[in-house]
Amino acid sequence: MAQLTALVIGGTGVISTACVHEAVRRGHRVTVLNRGTGAHGRLSLPPEVEMIQADAHDAESVRRALGGRHFDVVATFMAFVPEDVRRDIALFAGHTAQYIFISSASAYQTPPAHLPVTESTPLHNPFWQYSRNKAACEETLLAAYRESGFPVTIVRPSHTYDPTMVPFDGGWTVVDRMRRGAPVIVPGDGASLWTITHHTDFARAFVGLWGQPRALGHAVHITSDEAPSWNEIFATIAAAAGAEPRYVHVPSQVIAGVDPEFGAALLGDKANSMIFDNTLVKRLVPDWVATVPFSHGAREIIAWHDADPSRRTVDPTWDALFDRLAALMPTFES
C-alpha cells in the first residue's frame, strides 16, 4: 500500500497506541492530535509521529491547530455522543478521504438473539448508555454518508487489551487478591464465552482498512476468534500470576443491586456470551488473522506489572466492593 497521511485523534489509549505503532511500522505518516494529557503515554508513541495539541471536543481549537490540512485518513478515538461526530463531519468534510469512527461492539443487541454476532446484528443495548450513544453516533454518520457522501468507515472493537490492562473490572486489584488469597469475584457462573483481543491483532486489521474505498459506508467489527469462558480468563491470569485463587461466583443482578455502575457494565456487556463472525474484516483485509492467544497476552500483562511496583496499584474502593460481594454470597447460595 502507498504511504498515507493519517490524523489520529486520541492516540494514547490501549487501542489507539497500538494502531499508531502499526501505522508507523507500515510507513504511513501519522499525526496525533490530543490535549497532551493521555495517561497511556506510558507506552510511548514512535518518534516519527507528529504531535499536535488541541482539544478534540472544541471545533475552533482543532481548526486552528490543523489549519485546513487534508489527510488521507482521519481516525477518531474521542467521539462518544452524536454532537462529537456532527462536529467532526463539519470539520473534516472535504479534508479527508476516509473518516474512521471507533464505535463499540457493546452496541450490538444485548443479549444477542443469535451467535455468532455479525455486522447485521441489530444495535440495541437497553442496559448501557455508553453503547446507546455509540449507536446514535453511527446513525448520524451513516446519514451523512447517504446524504452527502461523507466518507465514513465504522469500526466496532470488542474487549481489546494490552500489557498495561488487566481485563477485569477492578484491574490489578483482582490480581492482588488472587495472590494474597482474598476472595476473587467472578460475575455469574463464569461460563459465558467472551471474545478477548490483543491490541496488536486489532491494530493490524485496523490499519489494513486505511485507504480502502470498499470500506466506506460500512461498519465492521475487529476481534479475535478466541472466545474463552470467564472462568478460563480468570484461570489464565491466575496461572500467569502464579496464584491459586479462591473464587466466589456472584450473579450479575446481585452485583447490579450493590453497585449499579458495575452492574450496568456487566448486564450491558460482559455477562452475555459474545462470539463474533469476522468474515467481513477478513474479506476487507485478506492477509489478516488474529494470532496472539490470550495465554501469551496474560503473561505479558503480569510481566509488565511485575516489572515496576508502581504499576501494581490496589484500588481500595474496588477492594472493599469485592469484600462486600463475597460476604453476601452465603445468603444467596444457601
State where each predicted segment sits:
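Conserved loop-to-helix N-cap of the C-terminal "lid" that shapes the substrate pocket in Rossmann-like
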Residues: 154, 190-203, 219, 227-231, ...
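Active-site "gating" loop of Rossmann-like NAD(P)-dependent oxidoreductase/epimerase domains
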Residues: 104-128, 143-148, 165
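Conserved beta-loop-beta element that borders a ligand/cofactor-binding pocket
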Residues: 138-164
